[in-house]
Amino acid sequence: MVSKGLLRLVSSVNRRRMKLLLGIALFAYAASVWGNFVNMRSIQENGELKIESKIEEIVEPLREKIRDLEKSFTQKYPPVKFLSEKDRKRILITGGAGFVGSHLTDKLMMDGHEVTVVDNFFTGRKRNVEHWIGHENFELINHDVVEPLYIEVDQIYHLASPASPPNYMYNPIKTLKTNTIGTLNMLGLAKRVGARLLLASTSEVYGDPEVHPQSEDYWGHVNPIGPRACYDEGKRVAETMCYAYMKQEGVEVRVARIFNTFGPRMHMNDGRVVSNFILQALQGEPLTVYGSGSQTRAFQYVSDLVNGLVALMNSNVSSPVNLGNPEEHTILEFAQLIKNLVGSGSEIQFLSEAQDDPQKRKPDIKKAKLMLGWEPVVPLEEGLNKAIHYFRKELEYQANNQYIPKPKPARVKKGRTRHS
């Protein structure tokens, strides 16, 4: 056992080392300032610049750094409800630094729960959740769900998976592993700790539907070997595993079949129709429409989806539930709408139709309305204006040479991404 005297000695040595390091740092800083001062005197003598303006050039960046440091020590978080220990849940969100996951993180944190975000940052970004870092209810873990995770939680929102065509076609094997092995690991965790698991499934399980609109009892029309099969079939297997664990192991599961969703924090280059059209319109490039543009989609704003996910998790509904906006638009109508909202003079360019592109997609949400009391409330134009504002700021950051991580490029032919 270490004696108190030895501990005091170690502490004293550490303090001396700290003082020495501080002294070295202060000396280096003083030397730098003196060098600049001498240089300024020389400049003044040569009549090139007054010493006062040079001092201001040096001091102002220092003031900025001090302000940044003060902000980091006095970080203000979004308002958080206080929940009693009985009501406060320990919640795990896989893929929680991604587009949808980060918005879900915001809601659950502000509702007063303890949230652990797990992400491998393949498509997720730390900047999406950095405003929570340091909060006592928040934890961020860099982890890939294809490896087991050991943690005590009450609820698991399993969102981890690439969701845009370029990302999951870039690495189809990884996509399959995330949706199968990753789901298996999360179900195993739910079984061990008695947690309820919500699987973020997708409308892609319906494939190119022969039934319109699509209700939860429709089995789908999917190409199992097509370019998108890694995602479509991966989610279908994930659903099957959820219900196998529910029947055999008694794990509580919830399955959300998510339709097209958009909003801030989408990757600008993720290859989906909303981000494609907004980015092209803002940059004055042609809006690329694949095929005739008569294909239909239904778009929901991200906050509506998040509310639906939370409602489903806390419900008694164990069968799959569609979460989407039943307001249907053709791709061509949607392109024209974004052009008008941006105020862009971009032309609309028609390209050859992509393989396996669904001709129609529209959710039947009667079940969500009846059993969850949920339906989308954000009007399409209101949501699009928010997304356009976000994309505009992202482009400004890039123009100012501020680093914005981008997803890895897909190894697919240009112009062949579907209207996801």
UniProtKB/Swiss-Prot annotation:
Principal location listed in the UniProt entry: Golgi
Domain of life of the source: Eukaryota
Gene Ontology biological process terms in this record: D-xylose metabolic process; UDP-D-xylose biosynthetic process
Keyword terms of this UniProt record: Acetylation, Decarboxylase, Glycoprotein, Golgi apparatus, Lyase, Membrane, NAD, Phosphoprotein, Signal-anchor, Transmembrane, Transmembrane helix
Pathway in which the depicted protein is active: Nucleotide-sugar biosynthesis; UDP-alpha-D-xylose biosynthesis; UDP-alpha-D-xylose from UDP-alpha-D-glucuronate: step 1/1
Post-translational modification N-acetylmethionine, affected residues: M1
Residues that carry a glycan: N316
Entry GO CC: catalytic complex; Golgi apparatus; Golgi cisterna membrane; Golgi lumen; mitochondrion
Residues found modified as Phosphothreonine: T94
The reaction(s) this protein catalyses: UDP-alpha-D-glucuronate + H(+) = UDP-alpha-D-xylose + CO2
SUPFAM superfamilies: NAD(P)-binding Rossmann-fold domains
Enzyme class: lyase
Subunit and interaction comment: Homodimer and homotetramer. Interacts with AKT1.
Family statement drawn from the similarity comment of this UniProt entry: Belongs to the NAD(P)-dependent epimerase/dehydratase family. UDP-glucuronic acid decarboxylase subfamily.
Protein name: UDP-glucuronic acid decarboxylase 1
Provenance organism: Mus musculus (Mouse)
Gene responsible for this protein: Uxs1
